[in-house]
Amino acid sequence: MAFFKIEYNSKVLGMERQVNVIYPDASELTAAEVDDNDIPVLYLLHGMGGNENSWQKRTNIERLLRHTNLIVVMPSTDLGWYTNTASGLPYYDAIAIELPRVLKRFFPNMTNKREKTFIAGLSMGGYGAYKIALSTDKFSHAASFSGALAMGMDG
């Protein structure tokens, strides 16, 4: 597998952003996945206080992915809650809309198919994963690990 640290200019946020990507070993990929631009992708969103490095520093993600055919994308969003707000930056647009387009330029073999596109997150990232998955048609599966899913609800 290969590990990429990418810094790109986010037009949506008006600043440089960072994203880490784990790309599967070519020997693990099928010819159809490569030829059809159909490598599955998982977006992993960090929690509050985290960044694009959190999943690698705090989990065994690389060991778990050693023999898979999955691209894993780990962006940084500061404390943006993966949300567009009136007084803050449009982090929802940056992650849900802009980032997949940016990554497709770097990784043209990454799938565009909903059934092979997944999203998950921890805490704040769990909230973001559900918010993005439920408000777009891009993701077939979503997971929230200790996500703050009841924000704004009474009791």
Label every model-predicted segment.
Residues 1-155:
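Non-catalytic cap/lid and distal C-terminal segments of serine-dependent acyl enzymes
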